[in-house]
């Protein structure tokens, strides 16, 4: 349970970071 939760959290964090980085670079959103 803990391992799965940690993995999901990391994936979500990476996705959010990527989205923020893309938005910041493009400046479209």
UniProtKB/Swiss-Prot annotation:
<comment type="similarity">
    <text>Belongs to the mycofactocin precursor peptide family.</text>
</comment>
<dbReference type="Pfam" id="PF23709">
    <property type="entry name" value="MftA"/>
</dbReference>
<dbReference type="InterPro" id="IPR023988">
    <property type="entry name" value="MftA"/>
</dbReference>
<comment type="function">
    <text>Precursor peptide that leads to mycofactocin (MFT) after extensive post-translational modifications by enzymes encoded by adjacent genes. Mycofactocin acts as a redox cofactor of nicotinamide-dependent oxidoreductases encoded in the same locus.</text>
</comment>
<feature type="site" description="Cleavage; by MftE">
    <location>
        <begin position="27"/>
        <end position="28"/>
    </location>
</feature>
<protein>
    <recommendedName>
        <fullName>Mycofactocin precursor peptide</fullName>
    </recommendedName>
</protein>
